[in-house]
Amino acid sequence: MPVDFTPEQWASYHQEWGDFQREMRLARSGNDTARGRAALMRFRQKAGMLRAAQTAGLVAAHVGRGYQVLVAVELVTTAADPVAEHLERLEIPVARIYGGGADLEAERLRFQRGDAHVVVFNTASAINLQANELMADGSRATSAQRIGIFHQPRYSGIQARQTIGRAHRDYQVCPWSLLYAAGTVEETAAKIMVDRLVVTSNSVDGDTGALHKIAALFGADWLPDSTLEP
């Protein structure tokens, strides 16, 4: 799902993209893997932060229509925190399942019991967020329809599939959207991710092929595949 940048956001994006390309060229010419990794991470951090307000606005609209919303992120300080803070400024309760400072199970239960209408999380496995979950105490999670949003593309198709499965289980259906800034390199990366989800079924070989394509898109095809994974 494309979102549109404001003129100010476009100015920031073009500056960051130019800085990234220059840094990646220098890293590649010196075969400096650490420098290349750092450049790619900085760009992904800044691209995610630029869109935090648009993601929060879309989430707020879904909450207004009665949904409970899952927001999947990869990075904390430049994605999870900004999105959660935007929502809390809109007086929308948010459960935070990321980082090490909170009781993550207590946060999960806040969302499942409806005390928080939104959960922002960065784990791809081992948590249940589906409607009507049967709890350990015999109670059930709320029946409110879940809807999911990828704030950032998961470059690993396998991890993306696992993330989708957090609420798309036990006969519960949770539709997902992938947000990206229209007209940017993120748009192409997002399309590669979606294509990989469509044509593979947890295929390790297929997932590696997608990582190669995305690496080439960023001029990072000389770096190890793990560079694109969180």
Task: Give the predicted meaning of each segment.
Residues 54-58, 82, 110, 162, ...:
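Alpha-helical elements of Rossmann-like donor-binding domains used by nucleotide-donor carbohydrate transfer enzymes
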Residues 11, 53, 81, 85, ...:
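Alpha-helical elements of the RecA-like P-loop NTPase motor core of helicases
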Residues 93-190, 196:
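Conserved RecA-like P-loop NTPase helicase motor core
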Residues 77-79, 102-103:
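Short, catalytically relevant binding-site loops at active-site mouths
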Residues 175-230:
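Non-catalytic, charged low-complexity extensions flanking SF2 helicase motor domains
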Residues 16-20, 62, 167, 196-197, ...:
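Alpha-helix boundary/capping residues
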Residues 1-69, 73-76, 82-88, 200-211:
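Interdomain linker/hinge connecting the two RecA-like lobes of the SF2 helicase core
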Residues 75-78, 124-126:
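Alpha-helix capping/helix-boundary segments
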